[in-house]
Amino acid sequence: MPGGKGKSIGGKAGSKDSAGKAQKSHSAKAGLQFPCGRVKRFLKNNTQNKMRVGAKAAVYVTAVLEYLTAEVLELAGNAAKDLKVKRITPRHLQLAIRGDEELDTLIRATIAFGGVLPRINRALLLKVEQKKKKDA
């Protein structure tokens, strides 16, 4: 019955091939670990006038967040490995972020318990070297 009432040929209820497939999240489709749905919800709730947010926008923002997180964690892990410890602390995050020029310009926040970067003024170093030469 193509034009009248009754059973239709297409549709979700009767198809067997869709019943065997598991649902895939937006994150799984995009190959991401961070949740696209949660990021989209945050974007919708935090925009003024409850503006509409596209699905691709949420995927792009999620991908950027995941990339930046992976970059910071990799550098902080290297800093922790250099100091021969197995746990990443705020100090390692501080050393990683301030050691990378691009991340330093991007993240201008103060990291709690991060400490300061080790740096000795050049004028002080020159005085110490001159004293060693005079003593020798």
From Swiss-Prot:
Listed Gly residues bias regions: 1-13
InterPro entries referenced in this protein's UniProt entry, alphabetically: Histone-fold (IPR009072), Histone_H2A (IPR002119), Histone_H2A/H2B/H3 (IPR007125), Histone_H2A_C (IPR032454)
Gene Ontology cellular-component terms listed: euchromatin; nucleosome; nucleus
Residue span of region Disordered: 1-32
GO biological process, one term: regulation of transcription by RNA polymerase II
Keywords (A to Z) from UniProt: Acetylation, Activator, Chromatin regulator, Chromosome, DNA-binding, Nucleosome core, Nucleus, Transcription, Transcription regulation
Gene Ontology MF terms: chromatin DNA binding; identical protein binding; protein heterodimerization activity; RNA polymerase II cis-regulatory region sequence-specific DNA binding; structural constituent of chromatin
Subcellular location(s) per record: Nucleus; Chromosome
Function statement: Variant histone H2A which can replace H2A in some nucleosomes. Nucleosomes wrap and compact DNA into chromatin, limiting DNA accessibility to the cellular machineries which require DNA as a template. Histones thereby play a central role in transcription regulation, DNA repair, DNA replication and chromosomal stability. DNA accessibility is regulated via a complex set of post-translational modifications of histones, also called histone code, and nucleosome remodeling.
Record family assignment: Belongs to the histone H2A family.
Quaternary organization: The nucleosome is a histone octamer containing two molecules each of H2A, H2B, H3 and H4 assembled in one H3-H4 heterotetramer and two H2A-H2B heterodimers. The octamer wraps approximately 147 bp of DNA. H2A or its variant H2A.Z forms a heterodimer with H2B. H2A.Z associates with the vps72/swc2 subunit of the SWR1 chromatin remodeling complex. Also interacts with rbp1/DNA-directed RNA polymerase II largest subunit.
Name of the protein this chain belongs to: Histone H2A.Z
The encoding gene: htz1
